[in-house]
């Protein structure tokens, strides 16, 4: 079997905020998308598209052969978006929830696909004021894609824990590091994927839903990981959007290296042990609730293991693959995330410090938005503040 290309592409969703009020821009001007289309058309880094809510926007990098190339593209997309939005009094924030937005105040983008979603899913989709990061890795063989999807699902909670950026919901500390997952889970066809023996079996299951008129195609299957409908890729979708660019590249590198590690096992007639969805879902919940703080269950040992220990084990597993891809620095950045916390940790820290400094609750929430605006466009290696966990 020929080794997959393992190309990489990254999609990120952002929220647009008003620079004066720091509230979500419920109805940004149409001219912004026109300007962005022109600005992005002048680069070869990727594309920008509207999202379900008018207050959201999505960027996607071009297909990249390395994490360095992906980082250059994603950094450029963030900068161009921020520069163009500033001309309209707006700013993007790479956070999976807004600290104090009210979903009932927002409008969805007038587009046939989104109109159908709004009609079908009603209040469930109107509450979807959330953003995620999707990482595509090129795996040309469709059956291999399905096999690796089943195996890498074990590691999805690890990736979620490293990306959490949604601790607040409607002005309150949700108590979860990723409240986005709680909101998104209200949609049908979400969560951990089923396992399939082949791509043909997967297609047969999808066709049942399509033939019954329930979905248009497999883009309406919103699992934490899925075979892409448009590209010969495996698409990781569990992640919150990372506020910091270096965190996003770390998680993309980890996902890519994990897939190659599992491919190496397959070439040696080995594979990662299959665990029931019940067990992986427990780790998914722990990542959603605690992020880096609570540890995950090692099912072989039958006990909760500190997340720092799990990351060291993971880094050892993928070391040969990081060397092949030349992304050692990106994967080792996981240790930095452990030290200073994810975006969720840092948002909570900024809020606590603002309150301790005498700010009102509303003022402290605005301070969190200011932190997110700055960190979204922070260059690689810039200081993120005090340690979080």
Swiss-Prot record:
<dbReference type="InterPro" id="IPR050141">
    <property type="entry name" value="GCL_type2/YbdK_subfam"/>
</dbReference>
<keyword id="KW-0436">Ligase</keyword>
<dbReference type="InterPro" id="IPR014746">
    <property type="entry name" value="Gln_synth/guanido_kin_cat_dom"/>
</dbReference>
<keyword id="KW-0067">ATP-binding</keyword>
<dbReference type="GO" id="GO:0005524">
    <property type="term" value="F:ATP binding"/>
</dbReference>
<protein>
    <recommendedName>
        <fullName>Putative glutamate--cysteine ligase 2</fullName>
        <ecNumber>6.3.2.2</ecNumber>
    </recommendedName>
</protein>
<comment type="similarity">
    <text>Belongs to the glutamate--cysteine ligase type 2 family. YbdK subfamily.</text>
</comment>
<comment type="function">
    <text>ATP-dependent carboxylate-amine ligase which exhibits weak glutamate--cysteine ligase activity.</text>
</comment>
<dbReference type="InterPro" id="IPR006336">
    <property type="entry name" value="GCS2"/>
</dbReference>
<dbReference type="GO" id="GO:0042398">
    <property type="term" value="P:modified amino acid biosynthetic process"/>
</dbReference>
<dbReference type="GO" id="GO:0004357">
    <property type="term" value="F:glutamate-cysteine ligase activity"/>
</dbReference>
<dbReference type="Pfam" id="PF04107">
    <property type="entry name" value="GCS2"/>
</dbReference>
<dbReference type="InterPro" id="IPR011793">
    <property type="entry name" value="YbdK"/>
</dbReference>
<keyword id="KW-0547">Nucleotide-binding</keyword>
């Amino acid at each position: 079997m020929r080794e997959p290309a393992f190309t990489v592409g990254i999609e990120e969703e952002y929220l647009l905020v008003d620079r004066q009020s720091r509230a979500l821009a419920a109805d940004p001007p149409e001219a912004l998308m026109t300007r962005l289309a022109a600005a992005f058309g002048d680069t070869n880094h990727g594309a920008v598209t509207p999202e379900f809510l008018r207050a959201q926007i999505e960027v996607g990098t071009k297909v990249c052969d390395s994490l360095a190339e992906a980082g250059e593209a994603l950094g450029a997309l963030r900068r161009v978006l921020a520069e163009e939005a500033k001309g309209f009094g707006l700013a993007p924030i790479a956070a999976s929830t807004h600290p104090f937005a009210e979903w009932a105040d927002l409008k969805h983008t007038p587009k046939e696909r989104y109109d159908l979603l709004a009609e079908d899913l009603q209040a469930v989709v109107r509450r979807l004021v959330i953003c995620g990061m999707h990482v595509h890795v090129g795996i040309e063989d469709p059956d291999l894609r399905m096999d690796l999807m089943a195996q890498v699902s074990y590691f999805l909670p690890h990736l979620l824990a490293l990306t959490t950026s949604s601790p607040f919901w409607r002005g309150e500390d949700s108590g979860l590091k990723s409240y986005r997952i709680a909101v998104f889970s209200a949609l049908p066809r979400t969560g951990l994927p089923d396992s399939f023996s082949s791509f043909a079996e997967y297609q047969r299951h999808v066709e049942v839903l399509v033939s019954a008129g329930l979905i248009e195609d497999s883009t309406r299957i919103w699992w934490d990981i899925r075979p892409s409908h448009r590209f010969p890729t495996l698409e990781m979708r569990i992640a919150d959007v990372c506020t910091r660019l270096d965190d996003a590249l770390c998680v993309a590198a980890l996902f890519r290296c994990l897939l190659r590690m599992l491919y190496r096992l397959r070439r040696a007639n080995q594979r990662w042990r299959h665990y029931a969805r019940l067990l992986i879902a427990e780790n998914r919940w722990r990542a959603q609730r605690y992020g880096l703080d609570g540890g995950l269950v090692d099912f072989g040992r039958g006990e909760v293991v500190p997340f720092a220990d799990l990351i060291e084990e993971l880094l050892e597993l993928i070391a040969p693959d990081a060397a092949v891809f030349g992304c050692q620095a990106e994967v080792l950045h996981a240790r930095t995330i452990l030290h200073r916390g994810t975006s969720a940790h840092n948002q909570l820290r900024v809020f606590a410090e603002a309150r301790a400094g005498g700010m009102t609750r509303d003022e402290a929430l605005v301070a969190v938005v200011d932190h997110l605006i700055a960190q979204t466009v922070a260059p690689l290696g810039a200081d993120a503040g005090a340690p979080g966990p």
